[in-house]
């Protein structure tokens, strides 16, 4: 993903969080449950937009390998930040609309 964004920067990033699922990768997983946070996140930088969406899901966008949601993989947010594509530091991201504290919706399995 980082290589693709580096090769062709994204002009508008949208994360659709109107309806989703948690607890697994699909409906075939017995513990999967529906989530209906009713949120849309949009921005002109895909790294910052994804960092905000990650935080809205109850995860720390500054987390790295070994911490949720990156328990078994490298953080694509860190890789993108290291490549100079944007920041994952919420203190450096301007958020408009509903404050993060009010919009958070826990997605933990």
Description of each model-found segment:
Residues 1-109:
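Acidic/aromatic/glycine-rich contiguous surface patches that form carbohydrate-binding/processing clefts
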């Amino acid at each position: 993903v980082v290589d693709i964004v580096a090769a062709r920067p994204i002009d508008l990033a949208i994360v659709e969080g109107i309806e989703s699922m948690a607890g697994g990768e699909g409906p075939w997983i017995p513990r999967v449950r529906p989530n209906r946070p009713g949120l849309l996140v949009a921005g002109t930088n895909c790294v910052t937009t994804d960092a905000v969406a990650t935080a809205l899901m109850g995860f720390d966008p500054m987390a790295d390998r070994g911490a949720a949601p990156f328990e078994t993989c490298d953080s694509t947010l860190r890789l993108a930040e290291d490549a100079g594509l944007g920041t994952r530091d919420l203190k450096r991201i301007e958020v408009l609309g509903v404050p993060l504290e009010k919009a958070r919706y826990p997605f933990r399995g």
